[in-house]
């Protein structure tokens, strides 16, 4: 955990992954780093090139982080596999073999918001995620199993594609009850082409997580610290 913090992880948790175990590796380590507040401030209405560039920078940082973590665990005699952004493929149903958000909820980092993004107490949804699997006997964190969004509808109203259904999540709930994932995808692509002038395979939008009440709390706290 110390190594991951040194590499920039701001949130770290351990998940019991017995039901998703691979080659005996039944512990998932979830890590998160926040999107800088100044980036989030500028994407409440539309994606920006600044955000697009930061998106790639943070993904690369996360890849390096979990690769270093897995290498360290292997050096200690355990099996470990880093699930980097560059190694994971997205299938036609927009799913991956290692669902970062599911691992993060099981590791206690946060819950799934109405936007179908992870929501954390400290940073809201303004986080990027990654993780690894290992058979090291790590003590699991307390999982989060219920939404804390309540009656909030900010992300639902902000979505330019009306892709967010507005359901409060509980662990195990099908994604289809929360988000029209393919509508979200097509909206992201269309907005990137319209606003940024290109689409090269990586999709961004950001409105839903930028307006999130928990994200807004993070922005206010960041502004307060900066002004002190």
Predicted regions and their residues:
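Non-catalytic, usually N-terminal nucleic-acid engagement modules in DNA/RNA processing proteins
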Residues: 1-64
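Catalytic cores of enzyme domains
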Residues: 20-23, 57-228
